[in-house]
Amino acid sequence: MNLKAVLTSVLFLSALYAQSQHGEINMAMGLKEVSEHDSSKKYKNVGDFFKKGEFEGHGRYFFMATDNSKGLSDFYANAFGMGIGYSMPRFHGFSVSMSGFFIYDLGSSDLTANDPLTGQRNRYEIGLFDVQNPNNHHDLDRLEDLNINYKYKGLDLKFGKQHINTVFINPQDGRMRPTLVEGLTASFSPGKKLTLYGGLLFGASPRSTVKWFQIGKSVGIYPEGLSADGTPAEYAEQVKSRWLNYAGLEYKPKENIRLFLWNQVFDNVNNTFMFQPEWIIKKRKFEILLASQFIRQQTIGEGGNSEVSLRYAEVGSYVNIFGGRFEFRKSKRWSVQLNYTNIGNTGRFLMPREWGRDPFFTFMPRERNEGYGDMKAINLILALQHKKLPLTARFGAGRYDLPDAKNAALNKYGFPSYYHFISELRFKPKGFIEGLEFFFLMVNKIGFGEDYNNPRFVYNKVDLSNFNLIVQYSF
């Protein structure tokens, strides 16, 4: 074991001891905030000051396996990782936070091997490690948080490397570690009804990587798909963008009404706007949630590059997206959702998959609807909560009608239309082992669109089953 691993283990055990009296912390979603109490009292010494800070830790085991259709390659992976974080005590509103994480491969398929029939690489399991270096199994470590935070009344500012959870940039926590960003983020709540959000980002460390990248260079790390003319996209390391900014507004004029506005500008690439109103109808024994969603995206500047072959987005392109949700909630025991999404046919919806999952109501694990135009989707989600046990379940079924798999102008990844099914179980015990969590996910996708008897339109896309087991402990 190298020195880095030894030091990490020592720090982890120290954190466990120091935090034996603290509550549950989920490192997968970022550092726990230190107390908002502004402690300006005098400390005995520097050591006493640091002892007043908060340690936290997270350990995760992840098993994943994919069973493709007959004749195509199957894969499995076992990953284990641990991390620690520390936040200094708040002083005159300021606090400094830092965290890191390392991952080990406990035994997996050869994730560097291409499928013999299609020549394509592994899609899902490689994401547990480093997609840029699939041969690296034992030295996967990443600095995650390193930031300074300031809080005053309803204002919250954070600058540096940090976790983030916004509409289009979010943890997408379906692998070992989430997507992280570098820059300035802010939120301000002048009252109980209104919250304002803003951010200026210039760097990112996408999920399934161990490095940090300038914001433009973080695009194209994952498979690039096809350009609108059907040729292989070549925008990796070619997106010329200096920054990304976002601004949002959440307004609750009444307890049962929520209005959400969001606008994101990706310098020299595109502008994406979202409006989402929600209305809750409360009755004595049940609730009904009605929500709609409108998204408009349009290319700005050069679409990422002045050379057509290196662009991320087509100049002059735009697309409108509409969505709706009906949700029936029966107490806290169960709920059912009916969701719908319609992406217009004027162009593709493009949002780097490296940054997070799409915000559509019809999102389901292990697939995205990014990269498509002229798409219609509908799904039904049932959520259940056990009456006595800390056990929840979620089941879903959806239909996703996509453009023809050969229509690259509206189908970036050459995907046939498909049915999507999910089954989830989550168990979070209480008492002595509180902080421990078990999660199981099974996904099935069945293609019904034309695949032209071409296995490249099938492999790791449709006619597959994907299995996931996660055991994690947070403190």
Can you describe what each PLM-predicted range is?
Residues 61-65, 100-106, 152-154, 161-166, ...:
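Transmembrane beta-strands of outer-membrane beta-barrel pores
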Residues 106-110, 197-244, 286-359, 442-462:
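Outer-membrane beta-barrel translocator/channel fold
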Residues 54-55, 92-96, 154-158, 193-196, ...:
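Repeated loop/turn-to-beta-strand initiation elements of outer-membrane beta-barrel proteins
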Residues 87-118, 135-214, 251, 257, ...:
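Outer membrane beta-barrel
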Residues 23, 461-475:
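Outer-membrane beta-barrel "beta-signal"
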Residues 57, 82-88, 146-150, 184-190, ...:
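Residues on the lipid-exposed face of transmembrane beta-strands in outer-membrane beta-barrel proteins
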Residues 51, 74-80, 140-144, 151, ...:
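Residues that define the transmembrane beta-barrel architecture of outer-membrane proteins
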Residues 59-63, 157-172, 196-198, 247, ...:
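Transmembrane beta-strand segments that form the barrel wall of outer-membrane beta-barrel proteins
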